[in-house]
């Protein structure tokens, strides 16, 4: 029995000895023969020493070779970049009796090309793995030309992940076939490399820290959005004759010239430092947003297609609104307007509250549907020519004595906010019937306001 037990106990011991002896060789059993980096991008003249990811004995004999010696050279692991292009560097060795080969793809970039932020090429390949034609995990100059659209927008800047964040776009200049580039909410401070992308049709660089951007070498540019860049003080779009959309709100831009932009459809300059706005002979311009600037002077001429003008919260004392046959929305509230001449056949929505208007002629607005005219020193509001008026806001006007709603029509969905703060109101002229009932409910007997119906 004792002999049997001794035999059994000796088996594990023998296995340990066997396993230990099998690994007593120059290299560990699990040794991997590969480089730490599978691909490296260098500029001409730079050099790098290739390192192996696993343990390699100093006694191991390694032979080195390079596929294209005109692109890079290799000497005992030291790689030197010679000329632009892509090549493979090989290391060969026999380990534990097995011949092994390690490979590293070396890209020598053209002069001026370098990805300062490694997140940029990494993110591009995550979004567009199809351009990595040689499957080496790097972007060659030739592969960069395959990309025509690149969207690097961060949806929520406060929740941006590390891999989404890009601090430098150096290297983007290699992507010369790009027609669309979106860098919204990115963490860049310099957009200079983008200026080399001459085929861009759409460029969105918004809510970044860039101080400037030049787009005059982008003749195909149609849609430019630079809003939210608090450090930008100027932009020149005179050379961008195909431009149809320009959004530069929330910048420090104080002057903009769109004289040459005959294709312009939409312009947004909200919350800029503009002091004047001149828009002339722009046949396709459809809407203008110029809210909360410092504008004291505007000129609108030759704008046959414009439908919306918003110039609220500025310093305007007068505005010329002649020859705007398509205008439907006009908002000029919170300015210093004392007069307002209105001959706009298609105007439906008019916001003029918080100005200094003592009188207003609404008789040439046959399509007027909504009027907001609070807080103006008016004495009378006459809507007798405005047959489709439905919404009226005319409150907090202590000087107001009369409102004339008698126009032969009444909308059963009418909303008349005409009571609060109108301490001097004496009479309201209405059409008899439903409108009369509406107003008598609003101003019951004893209110001091006479409801005169016909």
Predicted regions and their residues:
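Canonical leucine-rich repeat
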Residues: 169-172, 191-194, 210-213, 234-235, ...
């Amino acid at each position: 029995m004792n002999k049997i037990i001794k035999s059994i106990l000796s088996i594990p011991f023998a296995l340990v000895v066997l396993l230990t002896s099998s690994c007593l060789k120059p290299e560990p059993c699990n040794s991997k023969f590969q480089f730490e980096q599978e691909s490296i991008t260098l500029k001409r003249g730079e050099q790098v020493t290739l390192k192996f990811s696993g343990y390699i004995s100093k006694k191991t004999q390694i032979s080195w070779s390079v596929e294209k010696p005109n692109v890079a050279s290799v000497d005992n692991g030291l790689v030197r970049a010679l000329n632009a292009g892509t090549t493979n560097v090989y290391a060969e060795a026999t380990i534990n009796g097995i011949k092994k080969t390690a490979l590293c793809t070396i890209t020598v970039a053209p002069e001026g090309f370098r990805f300062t932020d490694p997140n940029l090429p990494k993110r591009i390949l995550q979004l567009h793995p199809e351009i990595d034609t040689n499957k080496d995990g790097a972007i060659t100059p030739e592969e960069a030309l395959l990309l025509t659209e690149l969207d690097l927008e961060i949806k929520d800047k406060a929740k941006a992940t590390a891999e989404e964040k890009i601090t430098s776009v150096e290297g983007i200049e290699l992507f010369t076939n790009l027609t669309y580039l979106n860098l919204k909410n990115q963490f860049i401070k310099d957009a200079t490399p983008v200026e080399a992308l001459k085929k861009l049709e759409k460029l969105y660089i918004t809510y970044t820290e860039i101080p400037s951007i030049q787009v005059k070498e982008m003749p195909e540019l149609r849609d430019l959005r630079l809003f939210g860049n608090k450090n930008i003080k100027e932009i020149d779009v005179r050379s961008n004759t195909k431009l149809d959309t320009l959004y530069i709100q929330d910048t420090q831009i104080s002057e903009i010239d769109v004289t040459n932009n005959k294709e312009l459809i939409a312009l947004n300059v909200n919350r800029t430092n503009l002091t004047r706005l001149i828009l002339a002979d722009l046949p396709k311009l459809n809407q203008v947003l110029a809210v909360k600037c410092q504008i004291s002077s505007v000129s609108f001429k030759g704008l046959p297609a414009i439908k919306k003008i918003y110039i609220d919260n500025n310093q305007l004392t007068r505005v010329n609104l002649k020859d705007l046959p398509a205008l439907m929305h006009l908002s000029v509230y919170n300015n210093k307007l004392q007069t307002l001449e209105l001959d706009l056949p298609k105007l439906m929505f008019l916001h003029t509250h918080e100005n200094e208007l003592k009188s207003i002629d609404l008789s040439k607005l046959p399509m007027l549907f909504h009027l907001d005219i609070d807080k103006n020193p008016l004495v009378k509001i006459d809507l007798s020519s405005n047959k489709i008026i439905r919404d009226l806001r005319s409150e907090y006007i202590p000087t107001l004595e009369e409102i004339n709603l008698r126009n032969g029509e009444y909308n059963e969905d009418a909303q008349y906010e005409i009571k609060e703060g109108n301490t001097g109101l004496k009479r309201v002229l209405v059409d008899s019937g439903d409108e009369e009932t509406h107003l008598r409910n609003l101003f019951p007997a004893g209110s001091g306001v006479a409801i005169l119906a016909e």
